[in-house]
Design a protein with these regions (language model features):
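N-terminal secretory signal peptides that target proteins for export/translocation
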Residues: 1-5
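Bacterial N-terminal signal peptides
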Residues: 7-18
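Low-complexity, acidic/polar, glycine-enriched regions of mature
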Residues: 23-194
Length: 194
């Protein structure tokens, strides 16, 4: 079994909201660990793209589809990073990058969801990484709620992404040697209505 990743976000988390199924009250959604993780990608010397994921994402999502309101509070365990390369994973966890010994979790918090008509488009929030907190807006690439037969309740999920400048959080490794500052983060989320 591979470790579980988000991202970043991540991330993200988020708006497990059903714009199609109207309910008058705010509901809590529990994350589905089998379908929730975060990934990141960064250019590697213009030759390839390094990718990895965090598989351990926990937290809560609250959503009111009628009011088009909600909140997200997600925690990512940094040690759950998985790139497919043991050596690269160890470097990602080192003080050069995520410094997992000092900063074992990432956190994304959002107090609002942005809709365009009935469609969820953004989840603006705050990302805490390496002990620093800065705003990040996750863009909804897809989002849907549906009746989940296995869980016997409504499930909502989607893919959300953002591009961040890692140096805002003090992750400066090799920037002075030409490595990019920008990192694409994606949060894949599914959650069950409680």
């Amino acid at each position: 079994m591979r470790p579980r990743l988000p991202t970043f976000v991540g991330l993200a988390l988020l708006a497990l909201l059903d714009v199609g199924v109207a309910r008058a009250e705010s509901a809590i959604y529990a994350l589905d660990a089998d379908h929730t993780y975060a990934t990141f990608a960064i250019d590697h010397n213009g030759a390839s793209v390094n990718r990895a994921r965090f598989d351990e994402v926990a937290g809560s999502v609250r959503f009111d589809p009628v009011a088009k309101a909600g909140a997200v509070d997600l925690y990512v365990q940094v040690a759950s990073v998985y790139s497919g390369s043991k050596g690269f994973d160890e470097h990602l966890l080192s003080p050069d990058l995520f410094d997992a010994a000092r900063f074992p979790t990432l956190r994304f918090v959002s107090e609002r969801l942005v809709f365009d008509g009935g469609r969820l488009v953004e989840v603006p929030g705050q990302l805490t990484l390496l002990g620093r907190t800065h705003p990040v807006t996750l863009k909804a690439r897809q989002f849907r709620c549906y009746p989940n037969q296995r869980a016997k309740t409504e499930a909502c999920g989607g893919d959300f992404e953002a591009v961040i400048d890692r140096t805002q959080w003090g992750m400066n490794y090799l920037v002075d040697k030409g490595m990019p500052r920008n990192v694409r983060i994606t949060a894949t989320i599914e959650a069950f209505r409680q």
